[in-house]
From Swiss-Prot:
It is found in: Secreted. The lineage of its organism: Eukaryota, Metazoa, Ecdysozoa, Arthropoda, Myriapoda. This is U-scoloptoxin(04)-Sm2a. One of its GO terms (molecular function) is toxin activity. Its main location: secreted. Belongs to the scoloptoxin-04 family. Expressed by the venom gland.
Amino acid sequence: MKAIYILSVLLLMMLPILSRFATSEGAAQHVEPIQKIRVEQNDCTRGIRCPRGHYCDPGLRQCLPR
């Protein structure tokens, strides 16, 4: 009986940590910095040249075909 009580207390202590990873909001927080890095690497306004026949759109920060 004492073991069940200890396990239930441990589970209640771990619940906020586990729920942070279970929600989509928490998962999005972990993925978001990776997406920001990719946008910055492909950002043509920071010195990356666009291929021939493309132009740099400063609003989208991407190379677009002409």
